[in-house]
A protein has these predicted regions:
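Small/aliphatic-rich secondary-structure junction motif
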Residues: 1-21, 32, 109-163, 182-188, ...
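A short acidic, glycine-rich active-site loop
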Residues: 161-173
């Protein structure tokens, strides 16, 4: 990823620096593609979340890459693993990897949220940038529409037809909104599809990314996530509790 973005890699190790750990790191690096820019390693003892968050600020990190468990159990969901805590507190964008590999696996399909939000344009722009740098030719923008917008109780053929018409109008509305965003983004040579889904935000796009076997899911960072959002999940919490694939959270 660093080579594709022509970026510097900064490794953060929380714990004591030893000769063995340095040797282990060099062994790992020797098994990967050579870096265009030399790696900088930060060795610091302390509480992992605090050390990493401070490093993000001090080193002016643009993207924090973390390994993450694919599915958290109930205890970890409420207590929060290191990766989840960093996701909520870091000031930069975050890439959560659930299937890291020494040998690069081609990225063939990126799914990105297209919900109506001030952050969405930047998120779509970032997904296109990643698509170009990862040489991915397929991007799907998912517009999640709440079922509450239908406001129709389907109990006969007439109400079913009415619901179908309303769904189509909502879909056209969302498609047009996303098309307006795409007018200002250079997406040449990328196949971009729009997909409207009616359902719960976060859960719906996560399920879609899973069944479509997307290689990367790109999401807006939540505006505010407190304890109530973790008890009554915010849309991003559905994604964090059971990662469907690698996830990029754009801040």
């Amino acid at each position: 990823i660093c080579n594709m973005f022509n970026a510097e890699l900064i490794g953060v190790h929380v714990g004591e620096k030893t000769n063995k750990k340095e040797a282990d790191l060099q062994q790992i690096l020797s098994e990967t593609d050579a870096l265009k820019k030399p790696i900088k390693t930060v060795w610091q003892e302390g509480e992992p979340v605090k050390v990493i968050l401070n490093t993000v600020i001090e080193e002016q990190i643009d993207l924090l890459i973390l390994g993450a468990l694919k599915k958290e159990n109930l205890l970890k969901y409420y207590v929060g693993s290191i990766a989840r805590k960093l996701t909520r507190k870091a000031s930069c964008s975050i890439l959560l990897l659930i299937k890291p590999s020494i040998v690069r696996q081609a990225c063939k399909h990126i799914v990105v949220n297209g919900l109506k939000d001030d952050k969405t344009e930047e998120t779509i722009r970032t997904s296109v940038l990643f698509s170009k740098n990862l040489m991915c030719k397929k991007v799907t923008i998912v517009e999640e529409i709440s079922q509450s917008e239908l406001q129709v109780k389907v109990d006969d053929d007439k109400s079913l037809r009415k619901a179908t018409i309303i769904k189509e109008r909502l879909k056209n509305r969302e498609d047009q909104r996303v098309k307006n965003i795409l007018k200002g983004i250079d997406s040449e040579d990328i196949s971009i599809k729009m997909q409207s889904i009616f359902g719960t935000r976060g859960y719906s796009i996560g399920h879609y990314a899973k069944i479509k076997r997307a290689d990367l899911l790109v999401m807006n960072a939540p505006t505010n996530v407190g304890i109530l959002d973790r008890i009554f999940p915010h849309d991003i919490e559905y994604i964090l509790s059971e990662l469907p694939t690698d996830v990029l959270i754009v801040k």
